[in-house]
């Protein structure tokens, strides 16, 4: 009778240990991929005109390092709609021009536009999930801008000037490199 009870206790203990181990491993893998997604995305091939490092940064901003920089504010959407929203705002007050502040936003993805960048000249650019430009709007002229006329290299250089410090702060090699798993999860999205 006693040996039967010991066997049951041993089996239950082993099952609990295996369950806790599996949960820990799954948590570690997810947190590793989220926290180091900028590093991983810099080491994956991606389509032309895509800048996926900003997409990964904004998708996983809660897990990312948010360096304290003078006049830079990080703000998740708050209020009743913010509880269910995935919106996140990054303001760079250091590059204000004519009271226009550069803002990088992660939007809800209802219409395929996942990210928005407001420059300090009153222009708004929307990007898809791979961080390719989808549309542009000039708020001072109150008109759409043909994206074929946008110098995309200059635009991305400007975004890097305003928010590139976030990429640099989060481009760190992880202790356990899970690049193969990241590639398996995100390769199709960026190619």
Listing of model-derived features with the role each one plays in the protein:
Residues 12-14, 72, 157:
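Exposed boundary/loop context
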Residues 1-25:
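N-terminal Sec-pathway targeting helices
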């Amino acid at each position: 009778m006693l040996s039967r009870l010991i066997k049951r206790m041993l089996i239950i203990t082993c099952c609990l240990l295996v369950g806790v181990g599996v949960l820990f491993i799954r948590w570690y893998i997810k947190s590793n991929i989220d926290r180091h997604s900028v590093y991983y995305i810099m080491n994956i091939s991606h389509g032309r005109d895509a800048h996926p490092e900003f997409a990964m940064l904004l998708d996983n901003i809660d897990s990312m390092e948010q360096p304290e920089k003078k006049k830079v504010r990080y703000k998740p959407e708050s209020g009743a709609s913010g509880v269910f929203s995935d919106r996140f705002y990054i303001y760079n007050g250091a590059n204000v021009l004519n009271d226009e502040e550069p803002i990088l936003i992660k939007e809800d993805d209802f219409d395929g536009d996942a990210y928005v960048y407001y420059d300090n000249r009153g222009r708004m650019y929307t990007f898809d999930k791979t961080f390719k430009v989808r549309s542009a709007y000039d708020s001072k002229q109150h008109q759409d801008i043909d994206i074929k006329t946008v110098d995309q290299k200059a635009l991305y250089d400007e975004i890097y000037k305003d928010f590139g410090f976030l990429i640099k702060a989060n481009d760190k090699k992880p202790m356990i490199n899970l690049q193969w798993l990241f590639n398996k999860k995100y390769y199709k999205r960026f190619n």
